[in-house]
């Protein structure tokens, strides 16, 4: 049987909004060689970094920006400011034909005057990576793109993302916009934890809207051996090819971030390499708190009917 390293999980859970530092393991495990500008492999349960390269390097996130766009929308839903069933009237600023910056970019293909639910716009943002869907949501939630970007950056601070600043709601190249593999892993962890009603959308393989069917660009969703259920791809000329993939193996979830790969296939291969390595070399185990009761067991023919179970409290 192959030896594994164990990631300790305390019963005293830490907040997902905390920033976690990379950890050195006491046992030498050779990480895979990754062909990308930067990368991170994170254990979801603990937030522990299993391997990383240039993880704090500020890079263009491209459409990985949309993870924060979706996160802000979900926070607005959680605070009851909007609902998934709200109907949004699409404005001209979300129309690709009227916005040259959208030429050649990913779209949901909205038109001015379209009436679309927040739920469908969220699906268009996640599955189609629709820049127009991002603008429509930003207008509805915050009254405009600049106001929405301000909200995005407020959550950057709340999540302690030290390497991140946003200038757009969609991720197209813009001066001053940057993030890191580490920060995007932390954001992905927050999304998985905090958006149970939305996260299933990240595994949706296609979306048909207005008679147009588009495939999710995350090719790992089709790999039946990996159990990948999200999260997002991104690409611009300045960013290269980015991918965040999360996979579940038994009770363990891993998050792989790859930034600046050289092709769509390359980003998938590098993310898969990280996930396979983590699954083969690590297990997550729970460390019980000293003196903490974790259950009871019935006793037959004893002087007590049951006994409490848990670690023995030690001293010194």
Predicted regions and their residues:
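Short linear motifs centered on Gly/Pro in flexible linkers and helix caps
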Residues: 19-20, 223
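A generic structural signal for short, solvent-exposed coil/turn residues
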Residues: 13, 31-33, 80-82, 102, ...
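Bacterial N-terminal signal peptides
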Residues: 8-17
């Amino acid at each position: 049987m192959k030896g594994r390293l164990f990631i300790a999980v305390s019963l005293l859970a830490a907040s997902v909004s905390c920033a976690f530092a990379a950890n050195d393991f006491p046992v030498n495990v050779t990480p895979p060689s990754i062909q990308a500008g930067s990368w991170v492999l994170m254990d979801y349960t603990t937030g522990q970094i299993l391997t990383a390269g240039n993880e704090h390097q500020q890079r263009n996130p491209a459409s990985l920006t949309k993870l924060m766009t979706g996160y802000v929308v979900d926070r607005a839903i959680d605070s009851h400011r909007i609902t998934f069933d709200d109907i949004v009237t699409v404005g001209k600023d979300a129309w690709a034909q009227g916005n040259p910056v959208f030429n050649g970019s990913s779209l949901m293909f909205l038109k001015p005057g379209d009436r679309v639910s927040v739920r469908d716009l969220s699906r268009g943002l996640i599955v189609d990576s629709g820049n127009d869907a991002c603008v429509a949501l930003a207008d509805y939630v915050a009254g405009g793109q600049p106001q929405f970007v301000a909200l995005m950056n407020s959550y950057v601070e709340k999540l302690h993302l030290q390497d991140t600043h946003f200038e757009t709601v969609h991720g197209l190249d813009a001066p001053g916009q940057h993030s890191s593999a580490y920060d995007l892993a932390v954001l992905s962890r927050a999304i998985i934890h905090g958006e149970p009603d939305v996260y299933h959308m990240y595994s949706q393989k296609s979306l048909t809207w207005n008679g147009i069917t588009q495939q999710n660009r995350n090719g790992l969703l089709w790999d039946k051996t990996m159990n990948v259920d999200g999260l997002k791809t991104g690409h611009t000329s300045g960013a290269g090819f980015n991918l965040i993939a999360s996979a579940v193996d038994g009770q363990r979830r891993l998050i792989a971030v790859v930034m600046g790969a050289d092709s769509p296939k390359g980003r998938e291969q590098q993310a898969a390499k990280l996930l396979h390595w983590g699954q083969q070399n690590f297990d997550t185990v729970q460390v019980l708190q000293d003196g903490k009761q974790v259950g009871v067991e019935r006793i037959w023919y004893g002087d007590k009917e049951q006994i409490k179970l848990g670690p023995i409290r030690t001293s010194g």
